[in-house]
């Protein structure tokens, strides 16, 4: 492998030396064995990006120029996919904290809301509104020399609008939204774990613009009752998959959404479970 190829591989994060090589300046032993990851797997910050890419291709959907909401953003695989496919901006929400990949946290097209429970009606719109209303004092409150993501002293901070923007980049809501943004999205995507999306749907369906698209990953093990899921969290009975589809479709109909497609994810879950995508619109 030539130096140019190694340089390109390390820049893209697709080279391994015991652990991922992330910078061309990383120093490796002269006899280091370089292993290249599958190019498809290295394209996004997580496998979720490949799942969403496959679903959007199968559905023939374009996100170019769209304002998108990513529910259950986590590392940001879906967000990464949306941006690479041409989305104008992505708002991500997650109940967790500090999971979003640095590549996305520093992207001016991304606004990350952490420690937000998307199940609560109005929670997402309220956080956007608070940030837009309160960001006049955001610059003064932020120390541009600090590293918010790596400072352990912030791990237990109460969630506030002023700690949403990444301190290293000082991304502001006004860089992404107009002041009168009504918290309506062209596209909503989501990858939720440990909660049924039927419980979250009533809170996110109102955020979809008329004729907007909703593409959600369905994980059957989180849509069934505890006793229905087998050892290791694996769903094995075909009848249970049918039950999940029926239950989820009914939940979408209750929210006034039209379901256009139900398709199997091109990539299985990391635990070996079959996963599905549902495509709906308002």
Task: Go through each PLM region and give its residues.
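S4-like RNA-binding module at protein N-termini
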Residues: 2-62
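A short glycine-rich, Lys/Arg-flanked "PGG" loop and its adjoining helix->strand segment in the class I
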Residues: 198-213
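Short, glycine-/aromatic-enriched active-site segment of Class I SAM-dependent methyltransferases
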Residues: 220-237
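Core SAM-dependent methyltransferase catalytic element
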Residues: 267-282
């Amino acid at each position: 492998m030539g130096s140019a190829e190694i340089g390109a591989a390390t820049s893209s994060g697709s080279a391994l030396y015991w652990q991922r090589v992330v910078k061309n300046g990383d120093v490796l032993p002269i006899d280091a064995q370089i292993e290249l990851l599958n190019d498809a797997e290295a394209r996004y910050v997580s496998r979720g990006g490949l799942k969403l890419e496959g679903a959007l291709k199968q559905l023939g959907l374009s996100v170019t120029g769209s304002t998108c909401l990513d529910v259950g953003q986590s590392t940001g695989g879906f967000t990464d996919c949306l941006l690479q496919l041409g989305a104008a901006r992505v708002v991500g929400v997650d109940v967790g904290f500090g999971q979003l990949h640095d590549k996305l946290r520093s992207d001016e097209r991304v606004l990350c809301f952490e420690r937000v429970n998307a199940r609560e009606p109005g929670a997402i719109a309220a956080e956007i509104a608070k940030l837009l209303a309160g960001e006049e004092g955001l610059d003064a409150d932020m120390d541009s020399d600090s590293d918010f993501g790596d400072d352990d002293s912030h791990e237990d901070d109460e969630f506030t609008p002023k700690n949403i923007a990444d301190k290293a980049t000082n991304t502001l809501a006004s860089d992404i939204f107009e002041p009168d943004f009504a918290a309506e999205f062209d596209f909503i995507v989501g990858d939720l774990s440990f909660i049924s999306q039927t419980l979250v749907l009533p809170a996110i369906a109102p955020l979809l613009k008329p004729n907007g698209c909703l593409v959600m990953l369905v994980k059957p093990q989180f849509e069934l009752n505890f006793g229905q899921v087998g050892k290791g969290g694996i769903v094995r009975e075909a009848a249970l998959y049918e039950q999940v589809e029926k239950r989820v479709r009914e939940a979408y109909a209750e929210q006034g959404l039209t379901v256009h497609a139900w398709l199997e994810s091109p990539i299985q879950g990391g635990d070996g479970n079959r996963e599905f995508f549902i495509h709906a619109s308002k």
